[in-house]
Amino acid sequence: MLRLPLKNGTVENYKLVGTPLTPQTPSISFNRIAFAAAHVVASPLFEVDPWQLSGALDWNETLKYRRYLWDQGLNVAEAMDTAQRGMGLDWETAKELIERTVNEARHHPLKPRVVCGAGTDQFGIEDFKNEDQIINAYSEQMETIEKIGGQCVILASRAMMIVSRGPESFLRVYNRLIEQAEKPVILHWLGAMFDPALRGYWGTESISEAVSYTHLTLPTR
């Protein structure tokens, strides 16, 4: 039963009708690998200072939602900037989220894949003065993810926009990260439409040039 507000300021009871859809595992194999950037479920029972950027999550409901996605044959992209990190989930909470999700996936009958966002958000943007500091920050998160058992998704970093000297800076940083990774990585970048501070990422505002840099120059694993 839902209680819906009306235009006249009153509330009306509304009863849902019909048969809810039941999640079903696909009967045939996907010809693509599909990852769901799953959201988290906030707990209304914990008092949290939003200015401290620490999340209060309902872990039971958060993991239940992931099982719901896995039951339908989807994989999960965890701790992503688009789903959680860009909305304020700090690295410490993201790290716990990654660990819980990876462990939960191990016990799921479909053995779903979990890829996890690695960024530089354990530090403030003002802390970065050079490319090596960015590499070290990325490496710290990547090593944590790999130790837990996840596969890394390299998230775009605002810090690169501060210290970058052009395309060569991006190629140097990303080459290092890809070469040292234990498994193939996924590059994740949505550009200015997601975050205006990322305008000109890869050292250019041209999509075709950015694609040529990443496709032709970065190593493949």
Task: Give residue spans per PLM region.
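N-terminal amphipathic alpha-helix/helix-capping segment at the start of soluble metabolic enzymes
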Residues: 1-38, 62
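Hydrophobic transmembrane signal anchors and adjacent membrane-proximal interface regions, especially
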Residues: 4-6, 160, 215
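Conserved small/polar residues in nucleotide/adenosyl-binding loops
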Residues: 214-220
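Active-site glycine-rich loop that binds ribose-phosphate moieties when present
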Residues: 204-213
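Active-site beta->alpha loop and helix N-cap motifs at the rims of alpha/beta catalytic domains
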Residues: 32-205
